[in-house]
């Protein structure tokens, strides 16, 4: 178990709407090793985002189990689950979810401050991460003064500020043009190689997915290895 950074076993997820029950995830099992770069591809409604939220402990499966670094998310208390997410995971979404009234630096510092870490250390770490994503010259700018690509880079820096082992990214380039998408992907590759951070990307962009070393295909709630 401990050889894997992430492992899920027979994950099922049902949603109940009145008398109707819909199964979104159907016996999903797979694993990731440290520093691996993996894409999950599939059409809208195939269950990709639901799986990602389940893997990150943001949603609970109806049955099955998820392990992060050998520790079960389902057996963890609420406080233990929060600590696991804070220690091992970073999250990036299609929409950056930056706080409009805060600068890029303050947005990136926020996860560390929420974790009650020293403000000076948080500032130093946030500056380092913004530099790593090529935004050291934009740290005092608010989101409204940044381009779409710059906002997503800030979101990536925020995901990295607690030095996670794994970043879960849900359509991280879904709102970006082709050129900006390429630059964000190059950044992800660079961070993967230089900092040994694993990335699990959910995307419908096959061109992007084909550049990753491993692809998984989600279809009708089933997950299988891609070509």
Swiss-Prot record:
SUPFAM superfamilies: P-loop containing nucleoside triphosphate hydrolases. Its EC number is 7.6.2.-. One of its GO terms (molecular function) is ATP hydrolysis activity. CDD domains: ABC_MJ0796_LolCDE_FtsE. InterPro entries: AAA+_ATPase, ABC_transporter-like_ATP-bd, ABC_transporter-like_CS, ABC_transpr_LolD-like, LolD_lipo_ATP-bd, MacB-like_ATP-bd, P-loop_NTPase. Coiled coil: none annotated. GO terms for biological process: lipoprotein localization to outer membrane; protein localization to outer membrane; transmembrane transport. Its main location: membrane. Residues 6-227 form the ABC transporter domain. It comes from the Bacteria. It is a peripheral membrane protein. Keywords: ATP-binding, Cell inner membrane, Cell membrane, Membrane, Nucleotide-binding, Translocase, Transport. ATP binds at residues 42-49. It is found in: Cell inner membrane. GO terms for cellular component: plasma membrane. Belongs to the ABC transporter superfamily. Lipoprotein translocase (TC 3.A.1.125) family. The complex is composed of two ATP-binding proteins (LolD) and two transmembrane proteins (LolC and LolE). Part of the ABC transporter complex LolCDE involved in the translocation of mature outer membrane-directed lipoproteins, from the inner membrane to the periplasmic chaperone, LolA. Responsible for the formation of the LolA-lipoprotein complex in an ATP-dependent manner. This is Lipoprotein-releasing system ATP-binding protein LolD.
């Amino acid at each position: 178990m401990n050889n894997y950074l992430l492992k899920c076993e027979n994950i099922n997820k049902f949603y109940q709407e009145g008398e109707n029950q819909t199964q979104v995830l159907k016996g999903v099992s797979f694993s990731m090793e440290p520093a691996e770069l993996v894409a999950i591809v599939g059409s809208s409604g195939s269950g990709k985002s639901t799986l990602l939220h389940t893997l990150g402990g943001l949603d609970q499966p109806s049955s099955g189990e998820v392990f992060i670094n050998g520790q079960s998310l389902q057996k963890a208390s609420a406080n233990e689950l929060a600590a696991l997410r804070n220690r091992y995971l970073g999250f990036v979404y299609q929409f950056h979810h930056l706080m409009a009234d805060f600068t890029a630096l303050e947005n990136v510092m926020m996860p560390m401050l929420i974790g009650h870490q020293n403000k000076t250390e948080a500032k130093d770490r946030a500056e380092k991460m913004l530099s790593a994503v090529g935004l050291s010259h934009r740290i005092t700018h608010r989101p409204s003064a940044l381009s779409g690509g710059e906002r997503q880079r800030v979101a990536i820096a925020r995901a990295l500020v607690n030095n996670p082992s794994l970043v879960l990214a849900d359509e991280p380039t879904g709102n970006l043009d082709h050129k900006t998408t390429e630059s964000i992907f190059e950044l992800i590759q660079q961070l993967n190689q230089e900092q040994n951070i694993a990335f699990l990307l959910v995307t419908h962009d096959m061109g992007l997915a084909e550049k990753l070393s491993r692809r998984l295909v989600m279809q009708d709630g089933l997950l299988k290895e891609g070509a």
